[in-house]
Amino acid sequence: MSRVQLALNVSDLESAVDFYSKLFGTEPAKRKPGYANFAIADPPLKLVLFEGAEGGTLNHLGVETENAAEVEAAEARLSSDGLETTGIDDTICCYATKVETWVVDPDGARWEWYVKTGDSDQLTNEIVSGGDTEAMCCAPVPSEPVTLGRVAETAPASSGGGCC
């Protein structure tokens, strides 16, 4: 099975592990000082956390689902685990109509759980119906980008695989 890998720098590993355990409903596959990784089955994702680095920016992260029921189930699970969400919104944003919910991690990275329901000619956010009238959008947010660092450069990995 193939899966996307996402490597994030975090300021507080314990807070990040707690958040991502709740976000994806699973515990880390590996934990070391300053490091944790998750082998997430659904959606297929390898999430790697490095503590303490600086630099880089990130607009947002997301999970695209197959239907609105999956967005609703995710929002219910996130809320019941104590994470603050925007609620479920029918939204026009980023040239699409969507059903979505958003949550923000301990370092300010925005996560969107959504299903695309159609196309749109509009980039900026318009909430058609639903929860938070101040909901987030995937359109650029120039005023306060999330800053994520880069892992320090190291010698090339051996032919046996990468660093993670």
Model-derived features: positions:
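Short acidic/glycine-enriched loop/turn segments that link adjacent beta-strands
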Residues: 32-35, 55-57, 94-99
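Conserved beta-strand in the GNAT
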Residues: 46-50, 112
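N-terminal beta-strand motif that seeds the catalytic metal site of vicinal oxygen chelate
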Residues: 1-14, 44, 60-61, 120-164
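Short secondary-structure transition/capping segments
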Residues: 41-42, 97-101, 128-129
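A short, sequence-level motif marking secondary-structure junctions
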Residues: 51-55, 118
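Residue-level recognition of strand-loop junctions within catalytic nucleotide-signaling folds
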Residues: 11, 50-52, 66
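Vicinal oxygen chelate
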Residues: 13, 62-110, 117-121
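Core segments of cupin and vicinal oxygen chelate
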Residues: 1-46
